């Protein structure tokens, strides 16, 4: 388009605007202003969110790979002056990372698997079967989402003490196997919403083929609910991985990563200085604590990077966004 054509087009637009009502002209001006301002506003919001999310991670990485003397150097901000892996190695040795990681995975993966099975069966029952007290029981499920775990922790402790399972993995496995583990309420709700969205004709066809309720659940429902199973599995893994409150109540010697990081200062003092009561500068502790946090979150970050797509699809199909 040459200059003359552009000039003619602008003149036509001016003539057209002169013929427009004042209300329409005012609307066009507001729309033009909005179209100009909104991209800038959106960019600022996204930049702020990125800063809030990425700043702790970048700070963690920066501190984990520097010497503790760099923490007292005001000229060192982001890039370490003395790049080293000593903090990572010392923290891993102090945490007994190998045994702690194995213990954490044993509780995490096992409880997550048990909780998936138990909450899936419960959610399927609420979605497809009619029985007395169904609404009341589902209200209890909603209360499990709203009521904090601290409310039932003391009765649970008395029960487990009577059973003789305190300081064993059974204190985590038993609630998971009975659909009462960490955040079990939201998992039941996810499965219920997903199973309610599946067509009833699937079960009718299975019934005509001679399948009972349990076989229908195994053969028809589970294959169609794999996205929800993956979503609940990721939720369960993250919540069990980060839990220290429940573990701290029931464990005195079984160590998990979350428990170790919660008590990281005496652990570091005992391992590095042979004195659990030693006082070290809080700023110097940062390199070890950030190294411990980095080692703890790395598996979760890697899992999310590789499974993000499936996780998002599962959330959308479960109905939590609708």
Pin down the residues of each PLM region.
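Short, Lys/Arg-rich, polar N-terminal cytosolic tail immediately upstream
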Residues: 1-33
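A structural signal for multi-pass alpha-helical bundles of membrane permease subunits
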Residues: 31, 38-322
């Amino acid at each position: 388009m040459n200059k003359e054509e552009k000039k003619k087009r602008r003149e036509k637009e001016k003539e057209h605007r002169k013929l427009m009502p004042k209300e329409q002209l005012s609307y066009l001006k507001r729309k033009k202003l909005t179209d100009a301002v909104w991209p800038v506003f959106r960019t600022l919001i996204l930049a702020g969110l990125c800063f809030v999310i990425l700043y702790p991670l970048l700070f963690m990485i920066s501190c984990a790979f520097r010497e503790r003397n760099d923490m007292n150097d005001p000229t060192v901000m982001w890039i370490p002056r003395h790049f080293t892996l000593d903090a990572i190695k010392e923290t891993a040795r102090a945490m007994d990372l190998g045994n702690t990681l194995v213990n954490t995975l044993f509780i995490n993966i096992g409880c997550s698997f048990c909780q998936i099975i138990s909450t899936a069966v419960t959610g399927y029952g609420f979605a497809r079967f009619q029985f007395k007290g169904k609404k009341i029981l589902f209200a209890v499920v909603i209360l499990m989402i709203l009521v904090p775990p601290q409310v039932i922790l003391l009765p649970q402790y008395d029960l487990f003490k009577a059973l003789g399972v305190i300081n064993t993995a059974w204190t985590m496995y038993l609630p998971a196997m009975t659909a009462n583990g960490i955040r079990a309420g939201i998992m039941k709700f996810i499965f219920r919403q997903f199973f309610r969205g599946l067509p009833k004709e699937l079960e009718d066809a299975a019934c005509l083929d001679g399948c009972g309720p349990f076989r229908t659940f195994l053969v028809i429902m589970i294959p169609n609910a794999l996205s929800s199973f993956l979503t609940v599995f990721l939720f369960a893994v993250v919540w069990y991985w980060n839990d220290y409150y429940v573990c701290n109540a029931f464990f005195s010697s079984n160590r998990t990563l979350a428990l170790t990081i919660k008590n990281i200062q005496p652990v570091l003092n005992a391992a590095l200085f042979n004195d659990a009561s030693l006082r070290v500068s809080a700023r110097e502790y940062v390199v070890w604590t950030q190294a411990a946090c980095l080692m703890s979150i790395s598996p979760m970050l890697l899992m999310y990077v590789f499974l993000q797509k499936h996780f998002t699809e599962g959330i959308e199909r479960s109905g939590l966004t609708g």
